[in-house]
């Protein structure tokens, strides 16, 4: 399957069903009362973690997802059926962003985790709901509310306990094969690994953890060079970083230290908190004579003396048990501190509960000239959408709700006169006061 780790989507929840206007018609009941039922609620859009999925390819191919609209109410106080919800299954490790604000809406980090992203509109009330002592035969009804609609970005960040990072050809893929049942492509040229590879490692004590071989980094990766951002984002989910270094570098200690600092600087530039992650420096290819000679250099000894270092040969599987033991010990410590605590100062990676703040928008009044006015705003739109002026009672209710907002008072203060016209979205109404 093609590995796709990001997709842009439009999701739309269902509209609520309209309330019904009807009256009882029965033998011997000549003046039956109102019995219009309420509309059903629109379906909502959910995302659900699915450990059987490993790519966002499905989302890339289908970019629009909609839940079903609610059904309208009916006679005899019959309630309209609710619209069917839409559940979109994504790989565990998917993060959903609001494209407009770039804030995190949800972190789907567990199998079967169900997250509500777009809520369906509430069904409108039927005329039976509006009967009272003053109006025993109302023709008032509510239209169903619109469902929420959003543009979102889905990103898949590999969920692994440990991430292998390093320059191309550091031997990460060979090491992954040595410690797990994974079979990544291995060859003697840069960028053999172009997608994250996962494997399950097992210690001598049968303790297991998940390892990700992350594609080789180059200088400037934090700025997006090479396949920079595409790879670096996967490291954010790893609790322990294993920095794999080719110890057989042609330029000895200078090569080893330079390569280490290059990768460290890229991690730091991309996300300051990556610098705080538990790190193990893995000096690889120790089966080669050049590597043995390089590590005799005092520069290397002094530079790494206060760091956690292990010497191994991924190809010959030498010292692998010690590496696995060190990783597992670091993991036990790291797992006591949640990942978002490590990143609590990083706004980019803040864990946010999906929540859309309702926009508070002032009512707007425009004098268009030639005896024409226009009113707009979120509050006005909600009234316009909720009370279609298809019946006389709804027109009266529409006017009453607008009056309650204070917009009529504003129009008077601005100089509206009898006979002027007021545009309210698709409606154009004559001012009669």
Curated annotation (Swiss-Prot):
Keyword set, alphabetical order: Cytoplasm, GTP-binding, Hydrolase, Magnesium, Metal-binding, Nucleotide-binding
Record-linked Gene3D superfamilies: GTP-binding protein OBG, C-terminal domain, GTP1/OBG domain, P-loop containing nucleotide triphosphate hydrolases
Gene: obg
Cellular location(s): Cytoplasm
Binding site residues for GTP: 166-173, 191-195, 213-216, 284-287, 313-315
GO biological process, one term: ribosome biogenesis
Protein name as annotated: GTPase Obg
Keyword Nucleotide-binding set for record: yes
Residues that, per the record, bind Mg(2+): 173, 193
A GO cellular-component term linked to this record: cytoplasm
Every OCT domain range: 355-433
One GO MF term attached to the UniProt entry: GTPase activity
SUPFAM superfamilies listed in its UniProt record: Obg GTP-binding protein C-terminal domain (SSF102741), Obg GTP-binding protein N-terminal domain (SSF82051), P-loop containing nucleoside triphosphate hydrolases (SSF52540)
Originating organism: Mycoplasma capricolum subsp. capricolum (strain California kid / ATCC 27343 / NCTC 10154)
PANTHER family tied to this protein: DEVELOPMENTALLY REGULATED GTP-BINDING PROTEIN-RELATED, MITOCHONDRIAL RIBOSOME-ASSOCIATED GTPASE 2
Family, similarity comment: Belongs to the TRAFAC class OBG-HflX-like GTPase superfamily. OBG GTPase family.
Pfam families noted in UniProt: DUF1967 (PF09269), GTP1_OBG (PF01018), MMR_HSR1 (PF01926)
Database matches in InterPro entries: G_OBG, GTP-bd, GTP-bd_Obg/CgtA, GTP-bd_prot_GTP1/OBG_C_sf, GTP1-OBG_CS, GTP1_OBG_dom, GTP1_OBG_dom_sf, OBG_GTPase
Top-rank EC class of the record's enzyme: hydrolase
EC number: 3.6.5.-
């Amino acid at each position: 399957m093609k590995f796709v780790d990001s997709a842009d989507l439009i999701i739309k929840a269902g509209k609520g069903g309209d309330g019904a206007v009807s009256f009882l018609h029965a033998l011997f009941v000549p003046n039956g009362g109102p019995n219009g039922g309420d509309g059903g609620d629109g379906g909502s859009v959910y995302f659900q973690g699915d450990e059987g999925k490993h790519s966002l390819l499905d989302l890339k191919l289908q970019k629009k997802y909609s839940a079903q609209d609610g059904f309208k109410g009916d006679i005899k106080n019959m309630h309209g059926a609710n619209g069917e919800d839409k559940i979109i299954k994504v790989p565990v490790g998917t993060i959903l962003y609001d494209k407009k604000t770039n804030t995190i809406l949800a972190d789907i980090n567990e199998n079967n985790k169900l997250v509500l992203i777009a809520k369906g509109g509430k069904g409108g009330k039927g005329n039976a709901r509006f009967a009272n002592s003053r109006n025993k035969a109302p023709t008032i009804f509510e239209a169903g509310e619109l469902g929420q609609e959003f543009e979102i970005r889905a990103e898949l960040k590999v969920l692994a306990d440990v991430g292998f990072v390093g320059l191309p050809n550091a031997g990460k893929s060979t090491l992954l094969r040595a410690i797990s049942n994974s079979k990544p492509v291995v060859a003697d040229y840069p960028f053999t690994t172009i997608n994250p590879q996962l494997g399950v490692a097992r210690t001598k004590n049968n303790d297991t953890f998940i390892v990700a071989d992350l594609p080789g980094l180059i200088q400037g990766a934090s700025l997006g060079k090479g396949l920079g951002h595409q790879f670096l984002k996967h490291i954010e989910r790893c609790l322990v970083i294993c920095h794999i270094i080719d110890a057989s570098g042609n330029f000895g200690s200078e090569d080893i230290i330079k390569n280490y600092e290059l990768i460290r600087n890229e991690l730091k530039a991309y996300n300051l908190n990556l610098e705080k992650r538990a790190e193990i420096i893995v000096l690889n290819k120790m089966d080669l004579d050049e590597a043995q000679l390089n590590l005799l250099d005092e520069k290397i000894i002094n530079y790494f003396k206060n760091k956690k270092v292990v010497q191994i040969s991924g190809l010959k599987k030498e010292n692998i048990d010690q590496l696995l033991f060190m990783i597992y010990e670091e993991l036990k410590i790291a797992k006591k501190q949640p990942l978002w605590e490590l990143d609590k100062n990083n706004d980019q990676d803040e864990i946010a509960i999906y929540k859309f703040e309702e926009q508070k928008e002032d009512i707007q009044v425009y004098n268009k000239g030639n005896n024409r006015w226009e009113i707009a705003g979120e509050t006005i739109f909600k009234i316009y959408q909720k009370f279609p002026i298809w019946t006389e009672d709804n027109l009266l209710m529409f006017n009453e709700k607008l009056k309650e907002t204070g917009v009529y008072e504003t129009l008077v203060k601005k100089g509206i006169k009898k006979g002027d016209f007021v545009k309210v979205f698709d409606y154009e109404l004559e001012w009669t006061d």
